[in-house]
Structures are given as structure tokens and as C-alpha cells.
């Protein structure tokens, strides 16, 4: 082992954070970068970066540098004793805990002392009664007077003491509650049961000595961000959708972040996936039914093939902070996108203390053109919904998260917003439209048989929806139904009515007619005049060999 000529010590939280790259809640981690200067001696130097966070991701530390020096080794070791530094914030919480503990113990001790006084008086009365029975006392007028005085003293004193007990019991319950809260706060710091931490040992060789700059990058767990949207739709001839895009950061890393340049990433580091999964040959064959046995019940057909789904992603590289675009009303985050993820550089430094459940930052604000339409899914809910259809023409990929929806300034509801990458179509439900009445008739099924060599079963399904437009203007209504999607060449599905065209996805601007998506979702759009009541029928036929049984399974 090389001889260390000089050891340099510094505490991690004394080094400013250059950047905090926070990943989504699926990853629950963040990557931090800190840069510091060190004056190296000639030869081998050891730089000890002390008090690494408790939630450090193992093997995530990497060190780079600038200057005339060579980095030979980076390792993580345990540090104990005097070098273990507890942050001031934690010391303050510990002091409160100790104060509440002393207050609780003081009340408990006072109660014990009062209880002992009561027990002493009770024992005195017991002893007097015992000696009276064995003849030790000669009862005369003075004895009776003394006993009466003793009993009176006992009664008055114990009544007062028991009142003190009841008061102390109340004080003790309050003190125990405050102690429990302080104890929980102390537990939450992560420092209560720890007497050691870790440090990074960096071995650096310098040929001539002098100043060098080192950058340490590491990952911590229990940090994440989730998106939140404020979506405001304005109706009218030219409807618009105003979107304000927020990020909510949760920070439980064990260290405080002070004025940190913040970057939010949509990447999902997969720490547990080390290599590309392997696939075997997937063979497909016809299932041959087993002979039926007398088991008192009916046998079923075996199921299909299931695969485990593994999502792989790697962390996007750290990026330099860019200048945010400035606006009179709202700051914006600079966006950097790669093939697998996007990064939002927040426009202002953030101060996020440890144990912060929600720190809200603004990512961006933009306006999208939108088309309003009415949609009903009568098989699920016989009501018409007002829907805003838009295309994400912004620079921001929209990540799935919660959204607050407003229509013309009025709050509609909170909903779960789905992913919408740049240029992707999406829709936002604006609530129920009470001016369009929907009645879904009972589904009618007809069975037919045909064929001479092979018997074919044909099932005709007829779904009828009655609608009434109570608006003073004409409206477009889309009736959304699902048709069976065949996964077997022996199963054939034919749409009888209405006539429909096949499309890759539903149009942003609905038009009169019917369209079928690859998922066999039928959008049947009709025009309704003011006050018009009409009935619309969706009818399709499902054909399959009579000897086979069809199983329907809805997949999203």
C-alpha cells in the first residue's frame, strides 16, 4: 500500500450541492453532485469526505477532478467516535426530546411521592386499629378525642392528596403525549440509534502538489418527485386549454438541501436489473382437451401464456444547469430530452430540508388548442361527459399524475392524468353534461347456427342507446362501445351497423361517422339538433366453431 503523506478531512454537508437530480417516484432516488477544492501535498494524499448520508445508494459514489493529479481509489468506510457529526437541526430535535423526557419523569416522580404519602397515612390508621384490638390502647375521653383528630386529619389530608393525584394523572398523560411526539420526531431524524456513519476515502496522487478540484457524485434513496397539473379549459368558438405543470418533491435523504440547483428527471434507474433478460423459444400449439372424467363437476379449458414484464431504464446523464425562461407571471423549467427520458431544470435554487413531504416547484405553463365534445360510454355509465381533446404541442412531456380540472373558472374535479409525450393526443374529462340524457337499453343477443361439415355458431349482439339533447344548440355526441377483438383465426367478428372505418387512434376533432381503433374501440359520433331525441344501434356478429367455447377478457 502506498504511503499516505497527508490526510485531508471535510464534512459532506459543508460542501455546497452543485446539482440535485431527482428521479420519479417509481425510482425513489436522487443523484447529488458537490465540488470542492483541496490543497494536495507531493505524493499520495487521502481525502476523507465525512458523514455520508444514511440513505446512500451503495456503489453509487464516483469522483472526478481537475488539476495535475491522479485519482487511484475511491472507497466507502465506517467512521465512529468523535468524527461522527450530528447536524444542528438534529441536535435541536434531540434537545426538545430530552426536555420532554425530563418533564415526563418529573411529573411521574411527583405522583409517586404523593402516592407514598397517602399510603403512609393509610398505614398509620391501620396500625392504630391493630393496637386497639390487642389492648395496647386504653380508651378514655382523651383517647377518643385523639382518634377523632387523627381520623379527621387523615380524611382531610388524603382528600387533598388524592385530588393532587388526579391532577398529576392529567399532567402525566399530557407529558407522555408530548414525549411520544418528540420521540417520534427524534426517531424520524434517523440519528437516534446511530453512533457511526460512513465516509468516502479518496486516494489522490500529486506529482508536484498544489490545488486540485474534486467533484463527488452519489445517489441517495427516499427522494422522489411527482407531477401535478392545474388544467383550466375555456369554452367558446376557439376553446383553449391552459396547463400549469408542477412538480412535488419529497425529500427524506437524511441531509438538508440549501439553495440547490434542482433538476427533475423522468428516467427510471433500475438498480436491481443488471443485464438484459434472456428469452427462450415461444412455441404455439392447439390445446387438445383432456378426456372428461366423472368428478362431479365440469372441467374448464386451460389458460394462455403469461410473461413477466421487466422494465429497464438507465439514469440519464447529469446535465449542466441552464438559464430558465423568464415570464412576468411564471418561471419556466428548461427541458432537455433524450431517447429514454427528459430533464426539467428548475429556474430557481431550492431549499429542501430533510423530512419534507412536499416541496412544490413550477415546471412550466403553456396553452394548447382544444376541441370540446360530448362522449358517453353507456355500457359503463349512462351519462354524457364533456371532454376536451388536445395534442401536446408543448416542449414538455407530460408524466402521469394528479390534475385539478377547471372549466371556465369553475372547479370540476380532481383526476388522474395519463402520460402524454410531445405530439401525443390526450383527452381530459370535464365532468357530466346534464343537458344530454342517455338511456342504455338492455343488450340483446341472438344465437344462430350454420355449416354442414363444421357447425358454426353465430352470436348477434345488439346494443341500443337512446339520447336526448336538451341544449338550445346542436351538439356532437360520441357513443363509445367496445367490440370483441379476436386473437384466434377461428373467431371472426363483423360489425353490422353502423358502417365504420379503421383508424390508428381516435381523432382530436370528432366528426360525424364511426371509427374503430386497433383495440376495437368503436367511436360512433352523431349530430344532435336542439331538443332532438334519437335511438342509435350498434350491432355486431361473433362467429366461432360450435365445438369451441369463447372466453372474454378485458385488457387495458
UniProtKB/Swiss-Prot annotation:
Q: Which domain of life is it from?
A: Eukaryota
> Any idea what this protein is called?
Protein F37C4.5
Q: Which residues carry this modification: N-acetylalanine?
A: 2
Tell me which UniProt keywords the record has, alphabetically.
Acetylation
Output the InterPro entries linked to this UniProt entry: CHP02231, DUF4139, DUF4140
The UniProt entry, under PANTHER family, shows: DUF4139 DOMAIN-CONTAINING PROTEIN, PROTEIN F37C4.5
> GO CC annotations?
mitochondrion
Q: Which NCBIfam families match?
A: mucoidy inhibitor MuiA family protein (TIGR02231)
